[in-house]
Design a protein with these regions (language model features):
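Alpha-helix capping/helix-boundary segments
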Residues: 8-9, 38, 70, 95, ...
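A general structural signal for well-ordered alpha-helical segments in protein cores
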Residues: 20, 35, 39, 52, ...
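Acidic catalytic patch
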Residues: 60-83
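Short active-site oxyanion
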Residues: 29-31, 61-62, 100-105
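Acidic, PIN/NYN-like endoribonuclease modules and their adjacent C-terminal/linker elements
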Residues: 1, 96, 100-125
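Short, well-structured N-terminal submotif of metal-dependent ribonuclease cores
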Residues: 1-34, 44-56, 125
Length: 125
């Protein structure tokens, strides 16, 4: 499975052809894992009702994993690995923890975040 970070979702939703066809293929193959905080970030930036509907439609139909206490574990992981010192906040730590727990690759355009993702969890297209 692959977790698309907010930056990747934005490129897909903007129909950026450098990303759109690859992501569409991953979606068709059921390879995308939805993470709640990513969709929360996407919803935070909507400007039109139609954008909200598109995002919520993806949310409703994509596979998800629920992990009890994942935010607490992400906070502990962040403290242990000093992620804040590298400019990585709790949301990215939660995304990283989802990747660790589900063994999903993480695809991001955020270079700061990318450097903190263990090599085996980095998605490269």
């Amino acid at each position: 499975m692959i977790i698309l970070d907010t930056s990747i979702w934005i490129e897909h939703l903007k129909n950026n052809q450098n990303f759109f066809s690859k992501i569409s293929k991953l979606l068709e193959n059921g390879e995308i894992l939805a993470v709640e905080c990513i969709f929360g970030e996407l919803l935070q930036g909507v400007k039109k009702e139609s954008e909200k509907d598109i995002i919520l439609n993806f949310w409703r139909h994509l596979p998800k994993e629920h992990y009890e206490n994942i935010i607490i574990e992400a906070g502990e992981y962040s403290a242990k690995n000093k992620l804040l010192d590298y400019g990585i906040g709790l949301i990215d730590a939660i995304i990283l923890m989802h990747g660790i727990k589900s063994n999903a690759k993480i695809w991001t355009l955020d270079n700061k975040f990318l450097r903190m993702i263990p090599e085996e969890l980095r998605y490269s297209k």
